[in-house]
């Protein structure tokens, strides 16, 4: 009886050990080789933002499955947000779980594998509430913008960053200050 009990216990223990699946945490570690941001100040006072990110995923990292972008405020509609990975449309566009206010792009089957490089594009069409009164001169408005960035625990290397502001049609070169 003792021998049979020991045999059953050993069999159950081996089954538990052999069928246990280790749970591995996601490790995001990547370089943003290039970030190009075009900010269009529209004549109706809204903003259109276009990003191009060239991302290299570290060989030791998990697949690069999501990318989050911070936005100036909450005055945007997710139906006006479009994304691409390597010029292929991204189906998952949602509210970011990590950046507030912000959006996330789920790369799904198009995730960037460890050691690979990919190009992520996003268009955020129509962010409202981005102009502010200029208290010194009521004929002017003020605006501010900061490009999206990633925490140092996730990113390494240098980034070639270009931010271009496109002013509304009709604004003359000597008018901005």
List PLM regions with ranges.
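Lumenal/extracellular ectodomains and adaptor appendage modules
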Residues: 21-177
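Bacterial N-terminal signal peptides
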Residues: 9-19
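Bacterial N-terminal signal peptides that target proteins for export
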Residues: 1-10
